[in-house]
């Protein structure tokens, strides 16, 4: 689990339940053809489990 330092300063609010407590994780989504991957920061509402993803850029380093 990662700290929510920058996310807490932005005062995230869950669009489903209006919750304000989130768990943060880092993630990666592969493109359709697999030539690139997109890095994302994931915020998961601790109240209802709603997932929000924030784009952090793309990478060609995909070693899965």
Curated annotation (Swiss-Prot):
This is Uncharacterized protein AF_2407.1. The lineage of its organism: Archaea, Methanobacteriati, Methanobacteriota, Archaeoglobi, Archaeoglobales. To P.abyssi PAB3148.
């Amino acid at each position: 689990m990662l700290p929510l330092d920058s996310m807490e300063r932005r005062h995230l609010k869950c669009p489903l339940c209006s919750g304000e407590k989130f768990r943060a994780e880092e993630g990666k989504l592969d493109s359709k053809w697999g030539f690139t991957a997109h890095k994302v920061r994931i915020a998961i509402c601790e109240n209802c489990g709603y997932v929000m993803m924030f784009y952090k850029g793309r990478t060609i380093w995909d070693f899965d």
